[in-house]
Design a protein with these regions (language model features):
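N-terminal leader/linker segments that initiate helical-solenoid repeat arrays
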Residues: 2, 21-83, 90-91, 110-111
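Residue-level recognition of tetratricopeptide repeat
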Residues: 29, 62, 111, 158, ...
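TPR alpha-solenoid repeat register
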Residues: 65-66, 80, 113-114, 120, ...
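Canonical tetratricopeptide repeat
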Residues: 69, 76, 83, 116, ...
Length: 324
């Protein structure tokens, strides 16, 4: 009983002492602690952040007299915490870097530091996207998409993030989501004047639409084929084969002027030998025949009468149109 009373008395004395010591803290004490934290930041940024947070607590306890010092202490916390993230990046400790940048962003919001907030968000976007790319390489597409979308929440204008996300959806076979994200990549990259991403994204969408258009053509779904192929052209995706299929599809739909235009565009891209150009002249001839322009039809069937198109074209010339 006696020992218990002695222990209780000792605790009371310590508590009273600590309370008085806390109350006895002055602005000068806070200044000394502030300067010590500044000095520590030269060698130990993580420790310096902890010490500066203690300075903020001291200033809060001291009150209005220490408000200016408290403001100074608060102002260094976001950039210091951001620098901790940089240290982790240099050490290639990326998960720790993410945690540090997220903390610096929170501090930047709390202390109204727009510059550090923007810088932290930019780094977080890059780190999450890099992590997502690693997951794509490991064929973990759903996990990758989750990381990409985390990164894009931090930087909604990060074109490389949208492009990477689109590629993950493509790997999954989700062309609709691929196109959606590629369009966002194009919009963001255009603002950033990133012509490499713009070109790559347009090529990816155009290539996909071209494949869909050719698949529709092979199923004789000519309206769908024309829609898909024209959409591909809208993304600056142009190939001689696309123009040939587009010309043939338009002829099947009796859109003769469009067929002639597409065939001529393909013809310009083709190697200029009779065997190579024959298929385009054949489509042009069909279109003129459909328009009942026999003179132009005959002229173009003659140009088409080579290789695989020779028999068909000669039959048109001799037996169908009876060209002179």
């Amino acid at each position: 009983m006696k020992k218990t009373l002695i222990l209780a008395f000792a605790v009371t004395i310590l508590t009273t002492f600590n309370t008085k010591n806390l109350q006895a803290q002055t602005k000068d004490d806070a200044i000394l602690a502030f300067n010590a934290a500044i000095e520590l930041s030269k060698t130990d940024m993580t420790g310096a952040v902890v010490k500066m947070q203690d300075v903020v607590k001291m200033c809060t306890t001291i009150g209005k007299e220490a408000d200016t010092l408290k403001m100074k202490a608060n102002s260094v916390l976001p950039p210091w915490q951001y620098n901790i993230g940089n240290e982790f990046i240099n050490a290639k400790k990326y998960p720790q870097a993410i945690a540090a940048y997220e903390k610096s962003r929170d501090m930047a919001i709390a202390y109204s530091d727009a510059n550090i907030k923007e810088k932290a968000e930019s780094m977080l976007a890059k780190l999450y996207v890099n992590d997502g790319n690693s997951l794509v390489n490991a064929q973990k597409y759903d996990e990758a998409i989750s990381q990409f979308e985390k990164g894009l929440k931090y930087d909604p204008n990060y074109s490389k993030g949208y492009y990477a996300n689109a590629m993950a959806y493509k790997k999954k076979g989700d062309n609709a989501k691929m196109k959606e994200n590629m369009d966002l990549a194009i919009a963001s990259a255009t603002k950033e004047n990133d012509t490499i991403i713009v070109k790559a994204a347009k090529n990816m969408i155009g290539s996909s639409l071209n494949q869909e258009g050719i698949a529709a053509y092979n199923k004789k779904a000519y309206t769908e084929a024309v829609t898909k192929l024209n959409a591909a052209l809208g993304y600056d995706f142009k190939t001689k084969d696309l123009y040939y299929v587009l010309a043939s599809s338009n002829n099947s739909l009796k859109k003769y002027d469009e067929a002639i235009e597409a065939a001529k565009s393909g013809l310009e891209m083709e190697v200029q030998t009779n065997d190579k150009t024959a298929r385009y002249y054949c489509e042009i001839a069909k279109a003129y025949e459909g328009k009942n322009d026999i003179g132009n039809a005959c002229a173009n069937y003659r140009k088409a009468a080579y290789g695989a198109f020779a028999q068909f074209s000669n039959d048109k010339i001799k037996n169908v149109l009876k060209c002179q």
